[in-house]
């Protein structure tokens, strides 16, 4: 007779932390320079005028203004721009 109960092992029991991706500032909203507009994996949204592209493909405002989303070109690329308010 065994004196210890046989202990099984599981290959589950792990989970990754949430990455909080997505659009942070929507079209028509005011934004300050340096603020994040979109956090993404890859370029689902492409930078337009007044928008910078970070090392992890994060889009951020280069100027103060209003956010504009548009679809451009034959490839129907979704572009994000920041239009400076006069």
Swiss-Prot record:
One of its GO terms (biological process) is translation. It holds the Pfam family Ribosomal_L27. Signal peptide: none annotated. It comes from Xanthomonas oryzae pv. oryzae (strain KACC10331 / KXO85). SUPFAM superfamilies: Ribosomal L27 protein-like (SSF110324). Keywords: Ribonucleoprotein, Ribosomal protein. HAMAP family: Ribosomal_bL27 (MF_00539). PROSITE patterns: RIBOSOMAL_L27. It comes from the Bacteria. This is Large ribosomal subunit protein bL27. GO terms for molecular function: structural constituent of ribosome. GO terms for cellular component: cytosolic large ribosomal subunit. Belongs to the bacterial ribosomal protein bL27 family. Gene3D superfamilies: 2.40.50.100.
